[in-house]
Curated annotation (Swiss-Prot):
Pathway: Carbohydrate degradation; glycolysis; pyruvate from D-glyceraldehyde 3-phosphate: step 3/5. The keyword Isomerase applies. It comes from the Archaea. Keywords: Glycolysis, Isomerase. Transmembrane segments: none annotated. InterPro entries: Alkaline_phosphatase_core_sf (IPR017850), ApgAM_prokaryotes (IPR023665), Metalloenzyme (IPR006124), Pglycerate_mutase_ApgM (IPR004456), Pglycerate_mutase_ApgM_sf (IPR042253). Pfam families: Metalloenzyme, PhosphMutase. One of its GO terms (molecular function) is metal ion binding. This is 2,3-bisphosphoglycerate-independent phosphoglycerate mutase. The gene is apgM.
Amino acid sequence: MKQYKILLIIADGLGDRPVSKLNGLTPLEAANKPAISDLLKNSMIGLMDPISPGVIPGSDTSHLSIFGLDPHVYYRGRGAFEALGAGATLKHGDVAFRGNFATVNNDLVVVDRRAGRKLEEGEELVKELNEKIKEINDVKIRFYKGTEHRVAVVLSGKGISDKVSDTDPHYEGLKVLESKPLEDSTEALRTAEIINILTRKVFDVLNSSEVNKRRIEQGEKPANIVLLRGAAHYIKLPSFSSYTKLKAAAVSATALIKGICRELGMNVVTPVGATGGIDTDYNAKAKAAIELLKENDFVFLHIKATDAASHDGLVEEKVKAIERIDKVVGTIVDNVGRDNLILMFTGDHATPVEVKEHSGDPVPILLYVPYPIINDNARDFNEKEARKGSLRIRGLDVTNILLNYSNRAEKYGA
């Protein structure tokens, strides 16, 4: 029996709700999608709950689920994945945080949680922090530049814990929070104290940085604090190949996703021009996926632009991003051949563009197979049509479904 290559395309934050600016259509409805529509002739569509109905997923927990790992078992916080994706090498016992370069006033009240989001000087600032803050109370500190305004911070040493609260207040106009222990332990208390010392040291370094003086002169907001959240102890995950028997690769420019995929043992490629934002080079990602499909059984293609547009409330940009993803689908199918490929297209969660945050809504999902199936005869691929389709699954079902339809699944039982 022929075994087919598998391509999983995730448009981050794809799911949406009717949008007033689109006369009640969702962005997926409004987008022109000729390549995706052409696949409907031999596809099943439906809805996926990344975690379970009504649960609002993080991008971390949803991707673990989609890759077949129950987040209730394997999730320990986002910080470690962000750090791995930003290039950190972690060892057992390290505690990692995800964070934002942000703007605060002299009273440490947050003015901009993302320092304008587009932070071209991030590498310079990370270098300066690493040169001037090496350790606190015998615990080594290391900073890693993430995507756009994001940064990861890793603590290495004895007697530290991930059971500490965030310093990120999550809203502008509020003061940077003091980290507090979340359990009654010496390790948690010690770690919270280290984080609070770190917050002040980071502010002192960044507030006097020549980089930020230059930004102010140019009329930009200074990136003068790092807001921390998502503390996580590093734990080793099983490799994707160990439970799927697939040789796997991924295309992504987003630190979190790269970190998860690397930890799962996938070959992760970030092509030149891929940014993890709205301005990403879609064609470069398509070409990378085409090349990886030559040598791998499974290729995961992640595109962040849809989520970035949603978080910023940019309706037209989300529609354009979906249309550009459609061109990616067409380019890959034309080059690889529709007879050689199982293709799944979905989102990792919904980010309604008028809400600007993740939601617990189910996400539309499409599964194309190159041989005769009982297809859904769908007229279009969108949230409304998906409700009429045959698929009603959880994220945890995705990997098994792909293995089944690619003729790679093993029998369960005698």
